[in-house]
Design a protein with these regions (language model features):
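Bacterial N-terminal signal peptides that target proteins for export
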Residues: 2-13
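Extended, non-globular or repeat-rich regions with surface exposure
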Residues: 4, 24, 165-168
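Intrinsically disordered, low-complexity segments enriched in polar/charged residues with Gly/Pro
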Residues: 5-6, 49-52, 75-76, 117, ...
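C-terminal segment of classical bacterial N-terminal signal peptides
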Residues: 8, 16-26
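Intrinsically disordered, low-complexity regions enriched in Ser/Pro/Gly/Gln/His and often acidic
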Residues: 23-24, 45-46, 88, 97, ...
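Secreted/periplasmic proteins that engage bacterial cell-wall peptidoglycan
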Residues: 27-87, 92
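Aromatic- and glycine-rich peptidoglycan recognition patches
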Residues: 93-176
Length: 176
């Protein structure tokens, strides 16, 4: 092998190595469900998914009706020990929604607009089945759900009574 050929091969390998090193960090993004749901919904709650429902109390309105942009909060269950959160990206019917979420079908990956159906006997979204990529269909597992946290609605403001600074017995009611 000539010096020129060796030098050219080394240069090509170095250039290829730099391209792979540049691409690798972006391709290696691994999303957990909670940080991804926070990123796309704007709901500023931190910690494991199974704590989002209780943490939303007093900060965000929540309920049993799905709305686009709301976060569906799953309870911890079986192999899903820390719960799950997913943003509602579409409403198909009163018992079917589309979810956008991470770390469900494949570890760390994002799935957009996948089906979830209400399988609760009361039709109250307390139990759902969710699309599972590896089988190309809804899974068999029925997942318990707390409900939906609404990103665009702050919790109802409650009056707060504070003492008067004048030393009198009158008090003022203020809104938070």
């Amino acid at each position: 092998m000539t010096f020129r050929l060796t030098r050219a091969l080394c240069g090509a390998m170095l250039a290829l190595g730099m391209m792979v090193a540049t691409i690798a960090p972006a391709a290696a993004q691994y999303w957990q469900c909670a940080p991804y749901a926070r990123e796309i919904s704007g709901i500023q709650i931190f910690g494991n998914a199974n704590t989002w429902w209780s943490q939303s109390e007093g900060k965000y309105a929540h309920g049993a009706a799905p709305k686009v942009g709301a976060v569906m909060a799953f309870k911890a269950n079986g192999r899903m020990r820390v719960g799950h959160v997913a943003m509602v990206s579409g409403i198909v019917s009163d018992r079917e929604v589309l979810l956008t979420h991470a770390n469900w079908s494949r570890g760390g990956q994002i799935e957009r607009d996948v089906r979830a159906i209400d399988v609760s006997s009361a039709g109250d979204w307390s139990e759902v089945k969710v699309w599972f990529g590896p089988i190309g269909d809804l899974g068999q597992t029925r997942f318990p759900v707390y409900g939906f946290i609404y990103a665009d609605q702050p919790a109802a403001e409650k009056p707060m009574q504070i003492a008067s600074l004048s030393g009198g017995s009158s008090a003022q009611k203020l809104r938070k």
